[in-house]
Amino acid sequence: MPTIAHLNGHAFAGGFMLAMYHDYRIMNPKRGFLCLNEIDLGVPLQAPMMDIFRAKLSPTTFRDIVLEGPRVGGSDALQKGIVDGLGGAEEVFGFIAERQLVGKAATGIYGIMKEEMYRTVLGGLDGHKQNLEWRESIEEGKGVLEKEAVKRVEEWEKNEKGKAKL
C-alpha cells in the first residue's frame, strides 16, 4: 500500500530517514526543518542508512544533505525534490485523491513494484555484514597508511637534521 509521511514539524537524523522510507512526503510549509545532522555530530551513517537518501534524492541534493547537514525548510525541500508537497492534513488527503492512491494496492503488486524500485536499498540492508567488513578494511588501511607516513616523516627528519637553513 502507498505510504505518506506527513511532516508537521522537525524531522532530524532518524526522523528524516524514516520519512524517506515512505513513498511520499508532505511537509508543513511554515514549521519544521529536515536535517541529516550526523556530519555535525560526528556520527557516520552506515551504508543501509545512506542508501535510502542516495536512492530518493538527486545526486546534488544527496551530497549537500549528507556532507553539509543543512536545515531544510518546506519550500526548499519541495524545490529540491525531498518532499512531494506542502501542507497539513487537508493537503495530504487532497494529494491522496489527486494521485488516486487509495486503489493502487488493489492489484496486489504494489509491494513488488517497490521491491524492484529499491532493489539496491534492500540489497544494502541484506548485505550489511559485508558493508561493515568493507568499512573495517578501509579503516584498517587508513591506519597502515598513517603509520607509514609518520615513519617516512621521521626518517626524513633524521636524514635532514641540521641541513635545513632558514
Feature-to-residue mapping (PLM):
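Glycine-rich beta-to-alpha active-site loop
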Residues: 1-41
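C-terminal long alpha-helix characteristic of the crotonase
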Residues: 27-28, 32, 78-131
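Glycine-rich beta-to-alpha transition loops that act as phosphate-gripper elements at the mouths
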Residues: 6-11, 65-71
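A conserved mid-domain beta-alpha-beta active-site/ligand-binding segment of alpha/beta enzyme cores
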Residues: 63, 76
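Eukaryotic N-terminal low-complexity, Ser/Thr- and Lys/Arg-rich leader segments
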Residues: 129-166
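Hydrophobic, secondary-structure "cap" segments at the distal end of domains
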Residues: 49-60
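Well-ordered beta-strand positions
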Residues: 23-24, 64, 68-70, 82-88
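Hydrophobic residues within well-ordered alpha-helices
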Residues: 19, 77-78
